[in-house]
Amino acid sequence: MAVDPFDSALDLLRRLNPKQTTDHLNAIISIAPDLTEDLLSSVDQPLTVRRCKQTGRDYLLCDYNRDGDSYRSPWSNQFDPPLDEAGSGGVGAGGNEGAGEGAIPSERVRKMEVKANEAFDVYRDLYYEGGVSSVYFWNLDDGFAGVVLLKKSSPQGGNSEGVWDSIHVFEAIERGRSTHYKLTSTVILTLSTSGGNLGEMDLSGNMTRQVEQDLPVENDDSHIANVGRLVEDMELKMRNLLQEVYFGKAKDVVGDLRSIGSLSEGARDREAQRELIGSMRK
C-alpha cells in the first residue's frame, strides 16, 4: 500500500521541534513543492507581523489572508504587495470562494470584520497588555467564517523569552434567529530561559481544541459578541490547561531530573530527612 506523501510530511512535522516549524515546513516544501498549498493550509505556524502601508498599523499574516506572496491588511482591506485583480464577496478573481487567493469579503461581512478587529484590539489590550491582533472574515454559502489571531512576545534581552500565538478559526452557519458556531483554536507557545545556575531550558509546543455551540442572534453585532465570548472562554480554558497540566507536569519531570542545588547538598538534605524520620519512630 502506497504511503501518502502529505500524511508523511505531517507525521514528520509532529516529531520535530515546534519552535522551528516554519524552517522545517520550508525544507519539506523545497523537497516536495506539489504539497505546498496543502501544507500551508494545514500546518499552524508562528504568526508573522507586518505593518500596513496605508494605515501604519501592524497586522498578522496567515494562510487566510494570503494570496501567493501578498497579504491582505484588515485595516485597509488592501493586499501588500498589490494584486493585479481581486474579487469581492468572498469570491476571488479566479472564481474561488472563501479566504485567501485574492478574495475579499462582501460589504456586509467586511463591516463585521472591521467591528471585530476593533473589538479584539480592545480584548488584546485588556488581556495581553500589548501584542498584535488581527481578524479576517470571508463568505460562505450559508453564513460566513473567520479567523482571530493574537500574538504576544516578551521583551528580548533578558534571561527569559516567550512567544504566545493563538489562532482561532470559526464557522458561523446562520439559521434564522440562531447561528451554529464551530470554533477550532490552536495555541503555539515558546518559552526559553537561561541563567548562571540553571543553564538553558526551552519549552515549545502547540495545543488544539474545538467547540461547537448554537447561540441566539439578533443582528450582525450579535455575531461579534458571540465570537468574542467563544474565543475568550476557549483562551481561558487553554491557558489554565497549559499552566496546571502541561507546565505542572514539566516542572515535576525537570525536578526529578535536575536539582537546582549541588548533588552533595541534595544528599545531605536526604540524609537529614532520614535521620529526622528515624528519630520520630523511636
Swiss-Prot record:
Region span, Disordered: 73-103
GO biological process, one term: barbed-end actin filament capping
Principal subcellular localization: cytoplasm
CC per GO annotation: actin cortical patch; F-actin capping protein complex
ATP-binding found in the keyword field: no
UniProtKB keywords: Actin capping, Actin-binding, Cytoplasm, Cytoskeleton
Highest taxon, organism lineage: Eukaryota
InterPro entries (UniProt xref): CapZ_alpha/beta (IPR037282), CapZ_alpha/beta_2 (IPR042276), CAPZB (IPR001698), CAPZB_N (IPR043175), F-actin_capping_bsu_CS (IPR019771)
Protein name listed in UniProt: F-actin-capping protein subunit beta
Organism of origin: Gibberella zeae (strain ATCC MYA-4620 / CBS 123657 / FGSC 9075 / NRRL 31084 / PH-1) (Wheat head blight fungus)
Gene responsible for this protein: CAP2
